[in-house]
Amino acid sequence: MAYSVSIKQSAAKALAKVAHEDQLRIIDVIDELKANPTAGGVLKGEFSGLRLIRVGNYRVVYEVQDQKLVVLAVRIGHRREVYR
């Protein structure tokens, strides 16, 4: 059962600001979430219910919507700024 991947508009804007080589790595990792959406760690606190995957110094915060078989990338950013 393969999931589809969606990227929130604000996350896409943040991705556009990242260096091209890092963009490609981030896109590859997001693509891999189609096959294994629970690959990332579970977040707590303010980000409860969301998951996180690390890509070098960047983080992708995403939500798995099991009913719709969708992985939604909510935030993409540098590790120092993604949680702000």
Region annotations inferred by a language model:
Residues 1-57, 65-70, 76, 81-84:
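Basic, Lys/Arg-enriched alpha-helical interface segments
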